[in-house]
């Protein structure tokens, strides 16, 4: 049974519309210059599993000690997709958001997040050099030749191919098991036994697959697609639609589908893999085509109601204990490499298992825009790529059977 929340998509579209017309304003007076006494509260929009206080599992809690040390009581709002995060930040009332690259630049350009004063975050110098000045959270908005920072790296990782190890006695080598009808190793078709992510950014997964298998399309970046390349990705997704059991964005539902509904292969996050692998025959792999992925940044709302508590959390978020525990819990890679060396849960090989060496294989999420960063075949101009709002409307159409 295919299920889609059209109310969710309506919310996402409204968020996009509001973002398009929101003023690109900075907080009055610029970034905070000194961290003062906490305001007593802190609200964070986050991915599932990112803000843990020992409720899901008593062994994973990086909130309670922070609250005791700062007096800042943490409330978190779980968002299922980047579009939901943008919509919530547009609505306002939140302090921080753990934004992926397909949301972070939209938040910056819309003026919904503020520049961060790195002088107030002493642990920033411990961040992975590959992430410190990444383009998904640094922008030279004032044109002075120096990029401003709009967030603090949190965790990164890949969108993996999760599979049932009783069906696949050997790891799948290609994403074809979820994109094209095929007979699986157990002798049965994959039709009705796979899932796909329902976010518009998933079009990039189809483009990445075509980039490997159809090089004549000239795809160089799965987020920078000319009209013909974009249409080819949509055609592949329409084929996939006939195979999909469910389009997922709710991690709990996906866990249940692999446990009880006969789903045996899907794009997923390491978080679901870790939850399922405790008592289900589940594993994951990055295939020959590579994978899309996320590098998440904690960003601060322009009108954050609790800025002092927010800065205290930004510093706390880089604590090696938090970074390592979260990486073990979520199946991600810490933004602070030292966490890989000192965390008991991760052990000496935990970061390697979670994909520390896969950085170059990952096409990290970013917001598609009309401006291309290349000139494929010499005939696609600098503004000939399909912008994100068309990714949204076309993904809705694909899911709806059009």
Describe each model-derived feature in a short phrase:
Residues 1-42, 402:
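Short, low-complexity disordered leader/linker segments with a strong preference
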Residues 29-110:
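Early extracytoplasmic/lumenal segment of secretory-pathway proteins
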Residues 43-58, 93, 98-253:
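Extracytoplasmic ligand-binding site segments that recognize negatively charged/polar headgroups
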Residues 95-99, 247, 264-269, 284:
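Paired acidic/hydrophobic, glycine-rich loop segments that form the ligand-binding mouth/hinge
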Residues 103-106, 267-281:
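A ligand-binding cleft/hinge motif common to bilobed small-molecule-binding domains
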Residues 123-126, 234-240, 278-302, 347, ...:
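Periplasmic-binding protein-like
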Residues 256, 362-402:
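Conserved C-terminal helix/tail region of periplasmic/extracytoplasmic solute-binding proteins
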Residues 296, 301-370:
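Mature extracytoplasmic/periplasmic domains
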């Amino acid at each position: 049974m295919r299920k889609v929340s059209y109310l969710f998509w309506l919310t996402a579209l409204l968020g996009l519309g509001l973002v398009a017309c929101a003023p690109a304003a900075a907080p009055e007076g610029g970034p905070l210059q000194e961290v003062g006494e906490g305001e007593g509260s802190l609200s964070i929009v986050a991915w599932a599993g990112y803000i843990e206080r020992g409720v899901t599992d008593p062994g994973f809690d990086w909130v309670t000690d922070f609250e005791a040390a700062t007096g800042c009581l943490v409330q978190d709002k779980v968002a299922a997709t980047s579009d939901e995060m943008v919509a919530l930040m547009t609505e306002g009332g939140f302090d921080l958001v753990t934004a992926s690259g397909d949301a972070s630049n939209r938040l910056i350009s819309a003026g919904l997040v503020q520049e961060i004063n790195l002088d107030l975050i002493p642990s920033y110098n411990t961040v992975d050099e590959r992430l410190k000045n990444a383009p998904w959270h640094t922008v030279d908005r004032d044109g002075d030749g120096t990029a401003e920072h709009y967030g603090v790296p949190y965790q990164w990782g890949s969108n993996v191919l999760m599979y049932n190890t009783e069906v696949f006695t050997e790891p799948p080598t290609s994403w074809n098991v979820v994109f094209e009808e095929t007979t699986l190793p157990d002798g049965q078709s994959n039709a009705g036994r796979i899932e796909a992510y329902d976010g518009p950014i998933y079009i990039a997964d189809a483009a990445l697959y075509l980039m490997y298998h159809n090089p004549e399309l000239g795809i160089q970046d799965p987020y920078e697609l000319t009209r013909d390349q974009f249409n080819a990705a949509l055609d592949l997704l329409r084929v996939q639609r006939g195979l999909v059991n469910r389009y997922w964005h709710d991690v709990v539902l996906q866990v249940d589908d692999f446990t009880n509904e006969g789903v045996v292969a899907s794009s997923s996050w390491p978080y679901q893999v870790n939850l399922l692998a405790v008592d289900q025959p589940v594993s994951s792999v990055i295939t020959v085509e590579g994978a899309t992925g996320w590098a998440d940044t904690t960003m601060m709302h322009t009108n954050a109601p609790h800025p002092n508590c927010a800065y205290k959390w930004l510093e706390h978020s880089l604590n090696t204990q938090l970074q390592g525990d979260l990486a073990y819990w979520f199946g991600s890679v810490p933004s602070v490499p030292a966490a890989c060396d000192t965390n008991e849960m991760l052990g000496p090989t935990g970061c390697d298992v979670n994909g520390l060496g896969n950085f170059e294989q990952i096409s990290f999420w970013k917001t598609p825009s009309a401006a291309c960063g290349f000139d494929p075949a010499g005939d696609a101009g600098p503004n000939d790529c399909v912008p994100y709002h068309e990714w949204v409307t076309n993904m809705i159409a694909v899911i709806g059977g059009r």
